[in-house]
Swiss-Prot record:
Listed EC numbers: 7.1.1.-
Organism of origin: Pseudomonas fluorescens (strain SBW25)
Membrane-topology descriptor: Peripheral membrane protein
Annotated region (NADH dehydrogenase I subunit D), positions in chain: 209-594
Function: NDH-1 shuttles electrons from NADH, via FMN and iron-sulfur (Fe-S) centers, to quinones in the respiratory chain. The immediate electron acceptor for the enzyme in this species is believed to be ubiquinone. Couples the redox reaction to proton translocation (for every two electrons transferred, four hydrogen ions are translocated across the cytoplasmic membrane), and thus conserves the redox energy in a proton gradient.
GO CC, any one term: plasma membrane
Protein name, per record: NADH-quinone oxidoreductase subunit C/D
Domain of life from the UniProt record: Bacteria
Keyword Transferase set for record: no
The organism's taxonomic lineage, starting at the top: Bacteria, Pseudomonadati, Pseudomonadota, Gammaproteobacteria, Pseudomonadales
Cellular compartments annotated: Cell inner membrane
Length: 594
């Protein structure tokens, strides 16, 4: 199934004000305060007392905002450029909503005072609000009355304080030296003990006693430091509780202590298999703040390298997924093919997994001599390899038996849980940002959006394999139609600046020195950019207070909601089905935990 048989999605229109008119007609214009931003969507402040009513209205419109795309907070207490903020806004909770049928977004914000950090839960409107609200409580200490289980999610249960508050230290040197004596070790071990009653689970049923099984956090099929506790009746999964946070490194906190430029390498480590794909939403969002329009050559280079990393990520997924269901050989072949891709990536960027190669206003350097030959060798090689994987593995009756009909969900369920990427398109929903909301010039390329219909573990795999074929088509078009021109924008905030801007007189040299050492000064505003990353939609929501560092960096990753969905999908299936399901999600814990 391809784009021709799917639901019509209208052309994207940034800052679409239709929903603002509908809200004003329903609640009156005095109920909202608009904030001018560079996020590309309406941003509206609403009183806390009206919040649930407003969000319910948006969820139930004729063309509803079916997805709670993101929910998080901001500590506004140290913000100096407060234009657009309500008076007394010490903290903000924001709700980013997405409508497929409108192909538009809206952001609703609530201002909170430090003395009253509480906002009603919206888990009754969107089930995926649960983990987001837990993270906001964990990071900021904001309470959500009515939440079914408001506990730590990123930090350990014994942690003290809320790390994303501005008064919480950002460097290890600001803490006392860490020590772990026997008593503290026993305390931590006891805190990690799973108690079924805490999660509303019974230890026994009418005629049976349930077994509780820890899968992870170091199980090979958990794909990283991920723990999931299973409530079992024999081999059948009665219920389960995913437990995340073991890979949390405080990436959003780090962004507050790095310059706009020096944070780029940290983005590589979010989805550590995505390479420059991680750089892209960040630099695009910074460029919105700066007002930078990059040359066509930069756009095309960025697209080509992003699609290379889509292929390398999908190849690793394919090999490990097939290995999870019992076939041991294909993973060695997929890793060999990844090496061929990395040969090209390393020749162009100088690095393999984590190039940190995109720059604010361009890329680190121009394409090397002979790059076309390397790219052509790869795109000539890969199609026949994908054909072999199809015949040898994906058409295999055992693999089909293990995955067809397993862990299936439909489009409605996917949207309610915030599922994006191949997981959403495997249900038949044709929503790929490269087509629906083109960025970086994707509208100039010819490619199809692979779809499936059943939303099961097999379809998720098939969609990704077809996506690799489409990525090869895009790379070939980049190779054949690479524009001439500079690899950096001629803009004062391009970082590092073009050398021509530095060699005019002493002032330009000083400007260059300050911009490289301290970092560029970005205008005070807010910006946002989402992209179709390897594992789904990835986005950066940046807040600048007019300085050399981000005031707040919100990183929304696709894998976080994908893991939250697990219990709703896998209940009633077997443990072996869970292994196939986990493999079909395609996640890494760095992408979940940040």
């Amino acid at each position: 199934m391809t784009t021709g048989s799917a639901l019509y999605i209208p052309p994207y229109k940034a800052d679409d004000q239709d929903v603002v008119v509908e809200l004003n007609n329903r609640f009156g214009p005095d109920a909202f305060t608009a904030q001018a931003t560079r996020t590309g969507m309406p941003v509206l402040w609403v009183a806390r007392a009206k919040l649930v009513e407003v969000l319910t209205f948006l969820r139930n419109l004729p063309k509803p905002y079916v997805m709670l795309y993101d929910l998080h907070g901001v500590d506004e207490r140290l913000r100096t450029k407060r234009q657009g903020l309500p008076s007394g806004a010490d903290f903000t909770v924001f709700y980013h909503l997405l409508s497929i049928e409108r192909n538009s977004d809206v952001m609703i914000k609530v201002a909170l005072s430090e003395s009253d950090l509480s906002v009603p839960t919206v888990t009754g409107i969107w089930p995926n609000a649960s983990w987001y609200e837990r993270e906001v409580w964990d990071m900021f200490g904001i309470d959500f009355p009515g939440h079914p289980h408001l506990t730590r999610i990123m930090m350990p249960p014994t942690w003290e304080g809320h790390p994303l508050r501005k008064d919480f230290p950002a460097r290890a040197t600001e803490f006392d030296p860490f020590s772990l004596n026997l008593a503290k070790q026993q305390l931590e071990e006891e805190a990690a003990r799973f108690r079924p009653e805490d999660w509303g689970m019974k230890r026994s049923g009418t005629n049976e006693d349930y077994m509780f099984l820890n899968l992870g956090p170091n199980h090979p099929s958990a794909h990283g430091a991920f723990r999931i506790i299973l409530q079992l009746d024999g081999e059948e999964i009665v219920d389960c509780v995913p437990d995340i946070g073991y890979h949390h490194r405080g990436a959003e906190k780090m962004a507050e202590r790095q310059s706009w430029h020096s944070f780029i390498p940290y983005t590589d480590r979010i989805d550590y298999l995505g390479g420059v794909m991680n750089n892209l939403p960040y630099v695009l969002s910074v460029e919105k703040l700066a007002g930078i329009k990059v040359p066509d050559r930069v756009d095309t280079i960025r697209i080509m390298m992003a699609e290379f990393f889509r292929i390398t990520s999908h190849l690793l997924f394919l090999g490990t997924y097939i290995q999870d269901v019992g076939a041991m050989t294909p993973v060695f072949f997929t890793f060999t093919d990844r090496q061929r891709a990395y040969k090209v990536i390393e020749a162009i960027t100088g690095f393999r997994l984590h190039p940190a190669w995109y720059r604010i206003g361009g890329v680190a350097h121009d394409l090397p001599n002979g790059w076309e030959r390397l790219v052509k060798e790869f795109i000539d090689w890969m199609p026949k390899r994908l054909d072999e994987y199809q015949k040898a593995a994906l058409d295999n009756s055992i693999l089909k038996g293990r995955t067809i009909g397993v862990a299936a969900y439909n489009t409605k369920e996917a949207l309610e849980w915030g599922v994006t990427g191949a997981g959403l398109r495997s249900t038949g929903c044709d929503f790929d940002l490269r087509k629906a909301r083109p960025y970086s010039g994707y509208e100039n390329f010819e490619f199809e959006v692979p779809l499936a219909a059943n939303g099961d573990a097999y379809d998720r795999c098939i969609v990704r394999v077809e996506e690799m074929r489409q990525s090869l088509k895009i790379i070939e078009q980049c190779m054949r139609n690479m524009p001439a021109g500079p690899y950096k924008a001629d803009h004062p905030l391009t970082t590092p600046p073009p050398k021509e801007r530095t060699l005019q007189h002493i002032e330009t040299l000083i400007t260059h020195f300050l911009q490289v050492s301290w970092g560029p000064v970005m205008p005070a505003n807010e910006s946002f950019q989402m992209i179709e990353a390897t594992k789904g939609i990835n986005s950066y929501y940046l807040t600048s207070d007019g300085g050399t560092m981000s005031y707040r960096t919100r990183i929304r990753t696709p894998s976080f909601p994908h893991l939250q969905q697990i219990p709703s999908v896998i209940k009633g299936e077997m443990v072996a089905d869970l292994i196939a399901y986990l493999g079909s999600i395609d996640f890494v814990m760095a992408d979940v935990d940040r």
